Amino acid sequence: MRLLVVLSRVPYPLEKGDKLRAYHLVSRLAERHEVFLFCLSDQPIDPEHVKHLQGICQHIEVVHLPRWRIVLRLITAAFSRLPFQVAYFHQRHAHRRFNEVIASFKPEHVICQLVRTTEYVRHHYELPKTLDYMDTLSKGMERRTETAPFYLRPLLRAETHRLIAYENLMFDLFDNNIIISAQDRDFLYHPDRDHVAVIPNGVDLSYFSPREGERHHDLLFTGNMNYPPNIDSVLFLARRVLPLV
């Protein structure tokens, strides 16, 4: 089967959770299918990273999103109902290139990671589609609103409502929906959320295995520390859990 996988980031190197999930998804799918990896990027990409990805899938395209176009897109999004997180990653030149890939590759199925990428396939009704929500972005935005400075709360609250509406819209447009955890599935506002398939993350035991030797750390927390839930987790661990140990 010809599969087109659409990502909002280049999934290498593996320093963020969405990259890790996408990397292993693509590598496993490419073992049995012809995979075209379509990536968006708002920063320069090391050619060696692209070369590495060429070794795990048959085709790859990286479309650069210039900063000035991102700013312009966010300004225009203020006068629409499109969530800013979606507008950030959606640009006309990228959409044109995406449509060219559709025409030339002729995918039999499209897989989008996060609703940030779904605007590209929104009007391709003829294509079977799967959306990996990963987590519920609207719930994350709602939580950020609670702790944000007062002057940012109206903006974040508006983004929360936009995300809820958009997540529900994409739910209906996609043939299949998957998510990482049952908890995140329950945070979706769609009445048919129980139909979302839960596919959790795992650990590659062929790569990660216990090692003998002296231990220099009793505990290590690793993750993207620009991501608010990770910050909350490590603070909870330090303040509430470690004092009990």
Identify the function of each model-found stretch.
Residues 43-49, 119-120, 139, 185-188:
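Short, charged/polar "capping" segments at the starts of alpha-helices
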Residues 8, 40-42, 65, 182, ...:
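Cofactor-binding loop segments of dinucleotide-utilizing enzymes, especially the Rossmann-like FAD-
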Residues 8, 67-84, 88, 129-169, ...:
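Acceptor-binding helix/loop patch of EC 2.4 sugar-transfer enzymes
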Residues 39-100, 104-105:
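A conserved catalytic-core segment of Leloir-type glycosyltransferases
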Residues 130, 138, 156-209:
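Donor nucleotide-sugar binding/catalytic pocket of nucleotide-sugar-dependent glycosyltransferases
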Residues 1-61:
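N-terminal subdomain of nucleotide-sugar transferases
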Residues 98-118, 127-130:
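Short N-terminal targeting/anchoring amphipathic segment
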